[in-house]
Amino acid sequence: MFQNHKSEILLATPLIKDDAIFTKSVIYLCQNDRHGAMGLIINKPLSDTLRDVFEELEISHHNTFNEILDYPLYMGGPISPHKIMILHTTNGRNYSSTIKLDEGLAITASMDILEDLANNILPEYFLPVVGYSCWTADQLTDEIKSNDWIVTNKLSKKILFNHENKVKWQNHIEHAGYTLQSLDSLFKNIGNC
């Protein structure tokens, strides 16, 4: 039976291991319907920064704050690894390719938001990602039933957009009501069934 998880968080369980992309991933689901799902991994920073993007796209950044220039890009997933998108809070600005999500969030994949960032015009929260993750019609439902993912609707923008990436997965696990010990115990028992 289909269940819509749009605007919810997927947390990789300990059953996903030895996977360079999805082990301990935190994924914000941007879209989920009967045709499939699309989400962004939000806790896997890359070595590239917004400075690299501005230089590659020849966006003027001479007056850009250093904290913006040094902002890391995140690997959103394995699909379209060169597509740059910004997950952000809505800020009243109209960009040419914004898709509004729930909880005051949006995703934009156009040059105008990058130009705003280079000009220090910032949404309250934002996260630049390259690539995305997607699932076919029943694939995500099957993976959830197989206990690959914990789904939580307990969205905290503060946790979602913070840069403590090494503990972001753990912070989301705890925000969802689990401890690492209870999670390990639960999945050891599942593995023994």
UniProtKB/Swiss-Prot annotation:
Pfam families: DUF179
GO cellular component: cytosol
TM helices/strands, residue ranges: none
Coiled-coil spans in chain: none
SUPFAM superfamilies: VC0467-like
PANTHER family linked to this entry: UNCHARACTERIZED PROTEIN YQGE, UPF0301 PROTEIN YQGE
Family classification: Belongs to the UPF0301 (AlgH) family.
Name the record gives this protein: UPF0301 protein Fphi_1754
